[in-house]
């Protein structure tokens, strides 16, 4: 009886672990797309579809050494400075 409970517990944990891993992968992709405007290398605009109503699309230097549009909520002046420097 104890062996059956142990095997059943291991099976439940394995299924739960697989489900969590799939959800984590989906979440990481969604967050990356939202943060980088789906990875599009286009000039930044005042707003982007991926930023929502309150977000702004601003330019930031990525680890690859390229400027990318990212969604930003926060300091208005910093956001506008980044927009201006990205359009050069």
Swiss-Prot record:
The keyword Secreted applies. GO terms for cellular component: extracellular region. GO terms for molecular function: sodium channel regulator activity; toxin activity. Residues 18-34, 88 form a propeptide. The keyword Secreted applies. Expressed by the venom gland. Pfam families: D_CNTX. Residues 1-17 form the signal peptide. Disulfide bonds join 37-51, 44-57, 48-86, 50-71, 59-69. Keywords: Disulfide bond, Ion channel impairing toxin, Knottin, Neurotoxin, Secreted, Signal, Toxin, Voltage-gated sodium channel impairing toxin. It comes from the Eukaryota. It is found in: Secreted. Belongs to the neurotoxin 03 (Tx2) family. 04 subfamily. Inhibits voltage-gated sodium channels (Nav). Causes scratching, lacrimation, hypersalivation, sweating and agitation followed by spastic paralysis of the anterior and posterior extremities and death at dose levels of 1.62 mg/mouse. Insecticidal to the larval and adult forms of the house fly. The presence of a 'disulfide through disulfide knot' structurally defines this protein as a knottin. This is U2-ctenitoxin-Pn1a. The lineage of its organism: Eukaryota, Metazoa, Ecdysozoa, Arthropoda, Chelicerata.
């Amino acid at each position: 009886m104890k062996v059956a409970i142990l095997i059943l517990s291991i099976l439940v944990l394995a299924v739960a672990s697989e489900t969590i891993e799939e959800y984590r992968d989906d979440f990481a992709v969604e967050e990356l797309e939202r943060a980088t405007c789906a990875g599009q290398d286009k000039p930044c605009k005042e707003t982007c579809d991926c930023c929502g109503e309150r977000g702004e699309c601003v330019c930031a230097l990525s680890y690859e050494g390229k400027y990318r549009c990212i969604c930003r909520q926060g300091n208005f002046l910093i956001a506008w400075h980044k927009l201006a420097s990205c359009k050069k």
